[in-house]
Amino acid sequence: MTSSKNPTNDNSYFDAVLVGAGIMSSTLALLISEVLPDIKFLILEKLNAPGSESTGAFNNAGTGHAANCELNYTPLDEKGNLIIDKALSINRSFETSMSLWASLYEAGKIDIKKFLKFIPHISFVSGQDNISFLKKRFQKMTENPEFIDMEFSTSFDEISSWAPLITKDRNPSTQIAATRIDRGTDINFEALTKEYLSLVSLNKNVEIRYKTELVDLKKIDKKQWELEISSEGRKTSIRSGYVFLGAGGKTINYLQKSKIPEAKSYGGFPVSGKWLICEKKDLTEKHNSKVYGKADIGSPPMSVPHLDTRWIDNKKLLLYGPFAGFTTKFLKQSSYFDLFSSIKKNNIFSMLDVGFKNNDLINYLISQSLKNHNSRVENLKNMMPSANPSDWYLKNAGQRVQIIKKTEGGGSLKFGTEIVNSSDGSLSALLGASPGASTAVSIMVEVLEKSVLFLNDKHNLQKKINDLIYPELSVSENYSTFIKEIKKRNNSIFGFHP
């Protein structure tokens, strides 16, 4: 597809419009620019800089999600069998992201030092039942090449060597266990977004408009959308053959404005977050890992605590949390009316049903909102017994909007991401949250392949994407062999030595 589809060649028409300049839209923009360099597309961003909302370094929780240590991705079924399908899927998607970064870095197009650092990923538990679960998880996961390098230990001294702050002031007789994968990462997705858009902006067919907000959109004929946009109080209209809605929590509002039939099944449930942050060098230098615990029985998945080493603005920090809360806003910089404006005739009953069914979530959010500083630090002490309240301060994290989807019985609350596509491929929207950013490449490849942009030359464009992400590698049906080759190549390019 080329911009020749615009017969009048006027400045108000674009082959594609991407709403939002976070990690999702910037990833899609990068893919379009690399495999369809001749099409004319526009990126709209409400704020004055890219990656400032959900993608912001302090605003996203899973910075390097690969399912190495997140125990909620490997649940037990009703018979006590460990299910690792989701962990495998997330890990493979993350490796796809790593492969794209490796290709772009090798070609001199991005600087990985600005956004990627290798850091071990650790799962930590205490108590015999949790230790049994972690051992079962270790045994099951190491049967797969994705997790073959995982280590397991119940040795207090060995776990101390992995994460000394976890064991300091902890009774050595306490039953504890941990797994570790050295090849974990910390990813600054805000910095990565800026790398992507710096590269994309070199394409003369791409325009990025900041301080520009989508007001409304409607389908005006079979091949075009009309979008009303506002910039510093001035409203104008543009047209496009394809629209991607990647505006974080606000996507649900925009999707509803589109009036596509596929939008009628959805609602959103906003959740806010807060971090405990430590900048003290004597502590940050002693902790070099991301450590995930296990959620209490009956607690929602978002309650899983983690103590992370993070690098933000070239500074090493410790972040613990996130502690959840409730607000009716869908973004940090949006309106308290977001939730209310998203309630429609076709989703109100599913939203009410979710509220009635999820008392544990409601109670959890209330309890989290009522916590003071000392009670949050007491929670931290479950993972870091030596924590001192004076060493930590509180900072607001980003907004998440969990998906509410209509079902035959009412509604269901979904944790994760979901793509909504119009039947003709002219509009796509990304809803949901975790593991989002880490799997952005796989998600955006799927978005692109189902879009009208791929309509006329799908096979050739799919080959271009494979060549971009996996140069000099043949996509093999034997995934075990393929993943080993991918990891070997990526490790070599990144200079990671297991």
Curated annotation (Swiss-Prot):
Keyword Acetylation: no
EC number: 1.1.5.4
Keywords assigned: FAD, Flavoprotein, Oxidoreductase, Tricarboxylic acid cycle
GO biological process: tricarboxylic acid cycle
Domain of life: Bacteria
Catalytic activity: (S)-malate + a quinone = a quinol + oxaloacetate
Cofactors: FAD
Intrachain disulfide bonds: none
Pathway: Carbohydrate metabolism; tricarboxylic acid cycle; oxaloacetate from (S)-malate (quinone route): step 1/1
GO molecular function: 2-hydroxyglutarate dehydrogenase activity; L-malate dehydrogenase (quinone) activity
Keyword Oxidoreductase belongs to the record: yes
Sequence similarity: Belongs to the MQO family.
Descriptive protein name: Probable malate:quinone oxidoreductase
Species for this entry: Prochlorococcus marinus (strain AS9601)
Origin organism lineage: Bacteria, Bacillati, Cyanobacteriota, Cyanophyceae, Synechococcales
